[in-house]
């Protein structure tokens, strides 16, 4: 059962044009994740792995439609602004892989997420995976390795 991410989850990548953002996006795409847009200020009109890049989260949503989850591949000092931008645009799930995010920034993000009935996974999170369906964040690598490490569970009729 996929709870936070599945094959239909529409994912946005903040920081998609950076080295880590492009690498993480490629891993997610190879696993089957439905990455529909990326955001890097000042880079509108570009594309990464065929994914359109926009200047803001709001602009991306206006162009591609609703987004279910954002992954913030941005440096720790930029995490707070990226997360708040995603939350204010209406995204309810935000994955934050960055480490060393200042504690005050974390408190601000958590308070904002609670007020907006949203969820932050991280900071310092490897991300999410629904085996055989989709992944978000750093849970990536060679598809064969992921499939060996993360397998769908067996359905039990008594549950």
Residue ranges and their predicted role:
Residues 13, 37-40, 96, 119-130:
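General beta-strand structural signal in soluble alpha/beta enzymes
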Residues 17:
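N-terminal Rossmann NAD(P)H-binding glycine-rich loop of SDR-like oxidoreductase domains
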Residues 21:
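N-terminal Rossmann-fold NAD(P) dinucleotide-binding loop
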Residues 26-48, 123:
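NAD(P)-binding Rossmann-fold cofactor-contacting core
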Residues 62-69, 73, 77-100:
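Rossmann-fold NAD(P) dinucleotide-binding segment
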Residues 99-119:
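Rossmann-fold NAD(P)-binding glycine/threonine-rich loop
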Residues 128-159:
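Conserved anion/nucleotide-ligand pocket segment
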């Amino acid at each position: 059962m996929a709870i936070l991410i599945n094959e239909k989850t529409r994912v946005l990548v903040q920081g998609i044009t950076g080295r880590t953002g492009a690498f993480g996006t490629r891993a997610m795409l190879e696993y089957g994740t439905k990455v529909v847009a990326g955001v890097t200020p000042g880079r509108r009109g570009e594309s990464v792995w065929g994914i359109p890049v926009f200047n803001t989260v709001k602009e991306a949503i206006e162009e591609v439609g609703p987004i279910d989850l954002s992954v913030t591949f941005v440096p720790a000092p930029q995490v707070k602004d990226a997360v708040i931008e995603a939350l204010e645009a209406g995204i309810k799930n935000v994955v934050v892989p960055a480490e060393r995010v200042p504690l005050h920034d974390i408190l601000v993000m958590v308070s904002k997420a609670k007020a907006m009935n949203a969820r932050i996974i991280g900071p310092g999170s490897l991300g999410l995976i629904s085996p055989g369906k989709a992944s978000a964040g750093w849970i990536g690598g060679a598809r064969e390795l992921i499939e060996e490490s993360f397998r769908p569970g067996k359905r039990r009729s008594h549950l």
